[in-house]
Regions:
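C-terminal beta-signal and adjacent terminal beta-strands/loops
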Residues: 624-632, 651-697
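Structural signature of Gram-negative outer-membrane beta-barrels, strongest in the C-terminal barrel
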Residues: 231, 351, 370-374, 378-382, ...
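Acidic, small-polar-rich N-terminal luminal/periplasmic segments of exported/outer-membrane proteins
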Residues: 34-168, 509
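Gram-negative outer-membrane beta-barrel transporters
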Residues: 546-633, 692-696
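Acidic/polar loop-and-plug regions of large Gram-negative outer-membrane beta-barrel proteins
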Residues: 208-212, 225-231, 235-295, 315-351, ...
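Outer-membrane beta-barrel translocator/receptor signature
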Residues: 132-135, 146-226, 230-236, 288, ...
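Membrane-embedded beta-barrel scaffold of Gram-negative outer-membrane proteins
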Residues: 295-299, 303-309, 313-321, 478, ...
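Surface-exposed extracellular loop regions of Gram-negative outer-membrane beta-barrel proteins
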Residues: 109, 247-261, 383-386, 468-508, ...
């Protein structure tokens, strides 16, 4: 498919208001517009922080909720883009990256969950989740092992799937067109399936054909997600199924530092440059998923909640990229500084994930104290069968790329890997006088990892959490919290000693202010310490020791406002100071954590205007700022500049029709996110224009 000219989407954007005005004029004599769904900006409750349906103002930990309407308004196309306006989240941590949704939270890596069950393990080979199938995304910042077991210190990103509703049959169908010849057909339909209202179904799906920023590569997807729900007098059961097939390639070409950020005048590569080999570079990923969610209330005191999921994912990832790592400052192999060597890489993981979480919930009182006690057991098993490609790359002139095919010898089977985790947890949410909430929790985990042909490794860990939040009046609720995490580290040192799990500890203090339902302001200060990080042994170059430590501290401010005159505002500001606090190499100690911005800020404003009885106009504008990043290594220290981007929305609703135009990176600013002393640069997003026409019924 030929790519659209960069100018053509902008011309379409300039022409769209005229087309929309014409549509409004034609609709003025038509039927009155249906009552429009309210744009929900200020979420009131979330389940990720406590695994119970708890008000945000009763949750003593920072959590952000991004609703489907909000991330659609902002023009998000993937999970990374959903989080661009969330406090403390570096959403595009590695720029435009089709391999996975890499983000950082408070300078550290989070773990990705879906519907409360873990979805990602390390560098996940699974296709990225389709956000058209989500109703919201919750971000819990900081360690969270008490409820979720082994996980990273950064926190949890929990994507919540669309589920069946028991009302009248409703839905939408739509088409999208946009930059890079994007063409997408999408639909969402659901409602009650019987007269009694005890059975409901929903179907969400889309088909997309598209190119992408990187030349040559496609970004095609098929997504199908049927679901069915049943509700009885005391029980509910929801079955969620999904199938996803992605045909794409690695958008990141690992462009050489010497030809991007540090390039000589006239020698900087365009961020769209493709340095791979057509027909070889590809990502082909299929994911099948089945989830069962069951709730049963025995009586007013005791209830059961159960969640089970099975995922089967198969991916082939192949890429030829520049070998900048052998000589980061000068990767060229010719006198004219044009030709570089390339590395041929291929991986073919076949993954099966089984997860189950079962909990009993007790709702009772002891004197003046109301308890919401949760006691649960969860289990997860991750299996991976892996093949790696045996191939040799070929040189290429990066300024006039004409590729020679790699030399491929075949696929080599790797040892199978299996990881299991069994955890038992208990949590008590104690409420006093309907004003003060105390949260106490503890957990014991047994984690086991096994690599075929090697001894298995077992880790046991106990983690704790505590939090206190109180309503002082006028909607002001200060809080304090402490939480822990652990993450098993597979392998052994040179002397046969198994590595210890990495440990994380966070102390947090903050204030939540909600004087009315349409306004929520959260301020949080935190300090995180992560220990047992692996570093090279200064006494033995062949050994690795766990003496590394990272300390992350910062301040966050986040607000959501929704006014009666169709005006909505969200804003976030964050300052993070993540640094290496302990290392075997004195050069690192006290230095900023690589590739981590210290400053983040964003704001989004949208306003609705009633044009007449049959039509409404909505305009939105957002600004995002990401501070500079540092990279320290053997090649010295480099700074990747900060960048500020703008996004825009123009939407017209005419009776049952909605026509929306989204533009992200409005000024088409070219930037990197980030560049590293290892020798490569990660390109940022270009301007992307997307037009969506949808019909609701």
């Amino acid at each position: 498919m030929p790519a659209l000219s960069p100018r053509r989407p902008l011309l379409y954007a300039l022409a769209l208001p005229t087309l929309l005005a014409s549509a409004v004029a034609q609709a003025q004599d038509g039927p009155a517009a249906r009552t429009l769904d309210k744009v929900t900006v200020v979420a009131e409750r979330a389940s990720t922080a406590t695994k119970t349906d708890t008000a945000l103002t009763e949750t003593p930990q920072a959590i952000s909720v991004v609703t489907q309407q909000l991330f659609t308004d902002r023009g998000a196309h993937n999970l990374q883009e959903v989080l661009r306006y969330s406090a403390g989240v570096t959403a595009d941590a590695w720029g435009l990256d089709t391999r996975n949704d890499a983000t950082s939270v408070r300078g550290l890596d989070p773990v990705q969950y879906q519907d409360g069950l873990r979805r990602s393990y390390g560098f996940s080979p699974l296709a990225r989740p389709e956000i058209y199938g989500l109703e919201r995304v919750e971000v819990l910042r900081g360690p969270s092992s008490v409820l979720y077991g082994a996980g990273a210190t950064g926190g949890i990103i929990n994507a919540m799937s669309k589920r069946p509703t028991f009302g009248a049959l409703t839905g939408e169908v739509g088409v999208q067109f946009g930059s890079f010849d994007r063409r997408q057909l999408q639909g969402d339909i659901g409602g009650a399936l019987n007269d009694a209202g005890t059975l409901a179904g929903r179907f969400v799906g889309l088909v997309r054909e598209s190119n992408m920023q990187t030349d040559v590569l496609n970004d095609d997807r098929i997504y199908l997600a049927p679901s069915i729900g049943w509700r009885g007098e005391r029980s509910t059961l929801t079955l969620l199924a999904s199938y996803q097939h992605d045909r794409t390639g690695s958008s990141q070409q690992f462009l050489p530092l010497a030809a991007t950020l540090l390039a000589l005048p006239g020698r900087r590569l365009d961020t769209s440059t493709f340095i791979g080999h057509p027909g070889f570079d590809r990502i082909d990923s299929r994911v099948y998923s089945l989830t069962a969610l069951f709730d049963h209330s025995f009586n007013d005191v005791l209830s059961l909640r159960s969640a089970v999921r099975y995922i089967d994912g198969r991916t082939t990832l192949q890429q030829m990229y520049v070998d900048s790592y052998s000589n980061p400052a000068d990767p060229f192999i010719d006198a004219d500084h044009r030709v570089v060597n390339r590395t041929a890489y291929g991986t073919r993981p076949d993954v099966q994930i089984f997860s189950a979480d079962n909990a009993l919930q007790f709702d009772f009182a002891t004197g003046a104290f109301q308890h919401l006690l949760l006691a649960g057991v969860d289990y997860s098993q991750y299996k991976e069968q892996l093949q790696r490609l045996d191939a040799t790359g070929t040189p290429i002139d990066i300024y006039a790329p004409v590729s020679a095919a790699p030399v491929v010898r075949g696929w080599d089977r790797q040892p199978d890997q299996t990881s299991t985790q069994l955890g038992v947890y208990v949590q008590d949410q104690i409420r006093w006088a309907d004003r003060v909430s105390l949260v106490l929790g503890a957990r014991r985990d047994h984690a086991r990892s096994k690599t075929e042909g090697q001894p298995s490794q077992t880790d046991n860990a106990t983690t704790y959490r505590a939090g206190l939040i109180g309503d002082l009046g006028a909607g002001v609720s200060p809080y304090l919290s402490y939480s822990e995490s652990f993450l098993p580290v597979t392998g052994q040192d040179l002397f046969g000693q198994a590595f210890k799990p990495m440990r994380g500890r966070q102390s947090e203090a903050g204030i939540k202010w909600q004087p009315a339902r349409n306004l929520l302001l959260t301020m949080a200060a935190y300090r995180i310490t992560e220990t047992n990080r692996q570093t090279n042994d200064p006494d033995n170059v062949l050994n690795v020791v766990q003496t590394g430590q990272i300390r992350s501290k910062g301040l966050e401010l986040e607000g959501q406002f929704q006014f009666a005159n169709n005006l909505t505002i969200t804003a976030a500001v964050a300052r993070n100071e993540a640094e290496v606090s302990r290392s075997n190499f004195a050069l690192e100690v006290g230095q900023r954590l690589n590739d981590t911005p210290q400053d983040l800020a964003s704001a989004w404003v949208s306003k609705g205007f009633q044009l007449d009885d049959a039509a409404r106009l909505r305009l939105g504008l957002g600004v995002r700022h990401v501070g500079n990043t540092a990279s320290l290594g053997n090649g010295g220290r480099i700074i990747t500049p900060s960048y500020t981007l703008a996004d825009a929305l123009v939407e017209v609703q005419v009776t049952d029709w909605t026509m929306a135009l989204n533009i992200t990176n409005l000024t088409d600013k070219r930037y990197y996110a980030p560049c590293r002393t290892f020798g490569d640069c990660f390109a940022g997003y270009p301007r992307v224009v997307t037009g969506t026409i949808s019909y609701r019924f």
